């Protein structure tokens, strides 16, 4: 099963088996107005049931993150690697400080902002 690349409040990951069992075998256009982490979308997509998808959420930062992952995956991965190196290299005592510094940061690039969203 495909899993979302981030955690999101109100996520539907636990409901995926039930929703997939009740979903039609073919969905011409899947519309998700509250995508969150996208657990349902990813499960349906990997099952091959979706022909076209329209994803939305009221959280602009979240939607920008989805666009960056779709359109600039290499940039997002590079930015995440920098965050991971700083966080994991800091040691357990300093990781809280790193987390709060990342949370307070304002990355200059779209990929950097997407990486921050995923990291947090």
Report the location of each language-model feature.
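Class I S-adenosyl-L-methionine-dependent methyltransferase module
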Residues: 42, 46-120
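S-adenosyl-L-methionine
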Residues: 1-35, 39-43, 48
């Amino acid at each position: 099963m495909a899993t979302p690349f981030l955690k999101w409040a109100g996520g539907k990951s636990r409901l995926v088996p039930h929703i997939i069992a009740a979903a039609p075998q073919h969905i011409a256009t899947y519309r998700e107005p509250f995508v969150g982490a996208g657990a349902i979308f990813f499960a349906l997509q990997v099952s091959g049931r979706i022909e076209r998808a329209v994803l939305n959420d009221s959280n602009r930062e979240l939607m920008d993150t989805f666009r960056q992952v779709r359109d600039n995956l290499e940039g997002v991965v590079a930015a995440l690697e920098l965050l991971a190196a700083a966080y994991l290299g800091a040691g357990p005592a300093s990781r809280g400080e790193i987390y709060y510094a990342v949370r307070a940061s304002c990355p200059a690039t779209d990929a950097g902002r997407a990486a921050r969203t995923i990291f947090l």
